[in-house]
């Protein structure tokens, strides 16, 4: 992610150092399973301990090897073997293929990211709840359908709907965390040619994961749970931001984002107070939707494996998490200092008071015994004449 929209907690998960540490975590879980289960591998527990005591990551050396091999996982495995001063290092990556390490690590990093996203969602929900508790939440504000005056409601009703949308998204994030419970250590083509089912299951258990039926890679539709959960949050945040933008339009002006002292809205028009924060949220939401489309396209791979998805995934997995956390944080800052112009909202509601009571007028006639069509027609005519 470019520095402007980077979120540090997400960066810490997806940065190269942590990615390689996660790869190492997967490799060590596999070695542990090889050494402690009855297999034809002669890796002893003592040799395993030698590996664990000496194995280390040297990023510079990894990059040096990769420049020659042009294969990041092969370079990683070679670097690890070089760090172990013993022949036992030959068992590193035994029976595995690169996708075993990459895809299982992806699952772990996605789960970590969702935990951070959960926290940011909770923070935003906190500020939304504070709005409901405010004295101004009971004030009247006009509801609008199709952009036209509908009925009078309260600010609390607006805020409650915002909360409901974000809570649905929050639930989707939690559900995605529970669904991301499978990994893959079944080797080339997913056939368990060298690494048996028992070894795979035991290694994955160490990582709090389960084995899955798949080819050489974890099917990309499996990761759609991650992207879909983020999409739900993005859509909920975008809706709130978009509503605030509408409420801040001149002539409406019932709510607006904070405008700080010394802030400028335009280089040419000094009077301008543009809703740049909520507009920024909507812009980043558009970007995320393009990532969601890419994630869907990545689900199609050639037979047992290809890497057509790889280049895009190096961007969309981490940047998706950056985007959603950034816009959640930005929305929290907007909500914390949201301008609620209750007097203007009251005036706007009063202007349309006759029209917004049309349902009550129609219902009164229905209660008097008139047909619904007659009641609707008469009420509509009276409203148009403003004759009540």
Model-derived features: positions:
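A helix-coil-helix interface module used to build multimeric assemblies
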Residues: 1-192, 197-200, 263-266, 276-280, ...
């Amino acid at each position: 992610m470019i520095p402007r929209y980077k979120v540090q907690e997400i960066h810490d998960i997806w940065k190269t150092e942590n990615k390689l540490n996660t790869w190492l975590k997967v490799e060590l879980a596999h070695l542990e399973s090889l050494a402690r289960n009855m297999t034809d591998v002669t890796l002893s527990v003592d040799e395993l301990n030698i590996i664990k005591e000496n194995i280390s990551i040297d990023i510079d050396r990894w990059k040096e090897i990769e420049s020659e091999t042009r294969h990041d996982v092969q370079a990683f495995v070679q670097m690890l073997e070089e760090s172990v001063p013993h022949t036992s290092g030959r068992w590193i990556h035994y029976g595995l293929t690169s996708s075993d390490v990459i895809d299982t690590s992806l699952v772990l990093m996605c789960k970590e990211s969702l935990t951070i996203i959960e926290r940011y969602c909770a923070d935003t929900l906190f500020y939304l709840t504070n709005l409901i508790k405010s004295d101004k939440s009971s004030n009247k504000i006009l509801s609008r359908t199709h952009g036209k005056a509908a009925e009078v409601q309260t600010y609390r009703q607006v805020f409650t709907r915002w909360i409901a949308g974000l809570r649905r998204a929050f639930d989707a994030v939690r559900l995605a965390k529970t669904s991301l419970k499978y990994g893959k250590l079944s080797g080339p083509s997913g056939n368990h040619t060298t690494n048996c089912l028992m070894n795979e299951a035991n290694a994955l258990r160490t990582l709090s994961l389960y084995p899955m039926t798949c080819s050489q890679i974890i099917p990309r539709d499996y990761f759609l749970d991650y992207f879909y959960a983020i999409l739900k949050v993005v859509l909920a945040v975008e809706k709130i931001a978009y509503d605030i933008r509408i409420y801040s339009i001149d002539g409406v002006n019932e709510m607006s984002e904070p405008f700080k002292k010394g802030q400028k809205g335009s280089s040419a028009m000094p009077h301008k107070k543009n809703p740049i924060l909520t507009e920024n949220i909507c812009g980043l939401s558009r970007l995320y939707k393009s990532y969601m489309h890419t994630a869907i396209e990545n689900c199609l791979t050639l037979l047992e494996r290809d890497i057509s998805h790889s280049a895009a995934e190096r961007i969309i997995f981490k940047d998706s998490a950056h985007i959603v956390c950034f816009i959640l944080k930005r929305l929290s800052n907007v909500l914390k200092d949201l301008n609620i112009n209750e007097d203007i909202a009251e005036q706007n509601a009063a202007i349309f008071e006759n029209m917004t009571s049309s349902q009550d007028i129609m219902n009164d006639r229905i209660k008097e015994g008139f047909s619904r069509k007659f009641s609707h027609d008469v009420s509509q005519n009276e409203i148009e004449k403003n004759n009540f």
